[in-house]
Amino acid sequence: MAMSTQPQDVIDEERATYSSLTLHRRCPQAWKYRYIDGLRRQRSETTPALDFGSWFHAVRALDRISKGWAEGTLKAHPDEIYTTDTGPSFPWDASPSDVMAAAVEYWGHLGEDAREAWLDWLGQPLPQRLSHTYREWRERWGQDSENEGVLAVEQRWEREVPGTGVVLWGYADEVYQDRKRGIVVVRDCKTSGTLGQVTSLDEMMDSQVQLYAWGLGPLCDEWGVPRPRAVAFDRVRSKAPKTPKLTKAGKLSASVKDYDLTTYLDWVGDGVPFEGMKKDGSAAGVYTAEEAEIERLGSPQVVSQWFARHLTPVSPYLVRSHLQAAADTCGDISLTRKRAERRGEAARNFGKAACQFCEFADLCRAQMVGGPDGEYAAEEYGLRYRDPDHSGR
């Protein structure tokens, strides 16, 4: 892909990930804290929003590796699949059921406060939610999966942006061959509390996976398959479905609609008694499953609130724009490194958007007042060093 190679574009060498580029664009000083100083936010005992995603990614990865291995399409796989910082890891040939069993054990070792935090956010204990989500995910995409040949899972890639001295690298959740369309696709899996409305245009402008498709091109050449022509997004809702409720008259309560078809059918079972509106009980009865409700819950509109996928073509023009932007940002990063070495700090992007939710905000304010050469204990600002032996100023 042709890129500008003017002398001012050439950097001695800079290696970057998408996350690094994004953070530097937000604020060079925040980038310095993370990538030069090695600072991270202190981990709390429980971070269910983040941790559930890690657990589901592990289940999903082993599911896809198993499929690729069984069908003989798998070209590459990691040695291990990880869950959370405090959770277990698994060999590449483990099964999803191994993760389920480990989740039960992990849950059993959590303290009462940690469990409460999980339940408040997730709506169910981790083992039950993980099992339900995985089962429903397989049911939802089973037919589509028959047309997919898994090539790689958790695949690392790196590639130089031509003529710039910039090397980009990252990890792709999955690379697969779409047998129906005859193309190779890079897929990104995302979990979130609820699934909002995401358009194809939004996903096309998400440069991360577009860049990954570009970065994986040479590996696809080595594997003897075509280079990626599309990117896919596999979105999964984390929060558990609610339990349906009945009114006294035996009607579904309008106040609770946030449940899926499986939850509804399990709740109904052989029927749910209701007391009726009359005091003598003569209007009591048993609620049974309604065909209209089953049809509603099985509709694409409702199902997409729990699981959603989109396929977006790789645009060479879009990729070129993002590569040029990446090279430009890496040029800025090189300047940040020089300034940080000389002055002990970097440029700051002042403003509510950059500072309001920045994990380094408290330390940043302290150093603006006291200067970068003072003594600042990371833990006093809710931070920790990635390297435990690091001694900060």
Task: Write out the residue ranges for each language-model feature.
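RecB-family 4Fe-4S metal-dependent nuclease core
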Residues: 1-393
